[in-house]
């Protein structure tokens, strides 16, 4: 990757990441207000939404061949990278353990992983359907 492409990629990732992080904040805030702090609905929601959209975008970007790299940087690496959050997932598991709600750790991880896999596959299926030439 030459220097110009590298800098363009960095700019696209930063742009997408800023928007994705802001979107994560908005979704998390809305769900916290709506459902309270008993369960990390915001993190679960952004990770599942991100899984679905990532599956869709992977197919959509791949259909564009070499012209898809800017979209991959902006949308997958930047936007979805900023939207989803593994570190928050792990931190929330630690909070459950420290508050003696260890059973919630297993439930939360199972829901996140199982539905995350389901959503990424559903997104990819939708992407294949929509982008089918």
From Swiss-Prot:
The chain crosses the membrane at residues 3-23, 41-61, 76-96, 103-123. GO terms for biological process: cellular detoxification of fluoride. Na(+) binds at residues 81, 84. The keyword ATP-binding does not apply. It is found in: Cell inner membrane. One of its GO terms (molecular function) is fluoride channel activity. Keywords: Cell inner membrane, Cell membrane, Ion channel, Ion transport, Membrane, Metal-binding, Sodium, Transmembrane, Transmembrane helix, Transport. InterPro entries: FluC. It catalyses: fluoride(in) = fluoride(out). Na(+) is not transported, but it plays an essential structural role and its presence is essential for fluoride channel function. It comes from the Bacteria. One of its GO terms (cellular component) is plasma membrane. Belongs to the fluoride channel Fluc/FEX (TC 1.A.43) family. Fluoride-specific ion channel. Important for reducing fluoride concentration in the cell, thus reducing its toxicity. HAMAP family: FluC. PANTHER family: FLUORIDE EXPORT PROTEIN 1-RELATED, FLUORIDE-SPECIFIC ION CHANNEL FLUC. This is Fluoride-specific ion channel FluC. The gene is fluC.
């Amino acid at each position: 990757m030459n220097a110009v492409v590298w800098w363009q990629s960095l700019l696209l990732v930063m742009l997408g990441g800023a928007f994705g992080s802001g979107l994560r904040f908005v979704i998390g805030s809305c769900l916290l207000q709506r459902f309270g702090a008993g369960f990390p609905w915001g993190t679960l929601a952004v990770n599942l939404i991100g899984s679905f959209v990532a599956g869709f975008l992977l197919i959509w970007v791949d259909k564009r061949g070499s012209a898809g790299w800017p979209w991959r940087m902006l949308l997958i690496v930047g936007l979805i990278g900023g939207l989803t959050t593994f570190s928050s997932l792990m931190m929330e598991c630690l909070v459950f353990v420290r508050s003696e709600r260890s059973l919630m750790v297993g439930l939360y991880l199972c829901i996140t992983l199982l539905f995350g896999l389901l959503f990424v596959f559903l997104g990819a299926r939708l992407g294949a359907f929509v982008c089918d030439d």
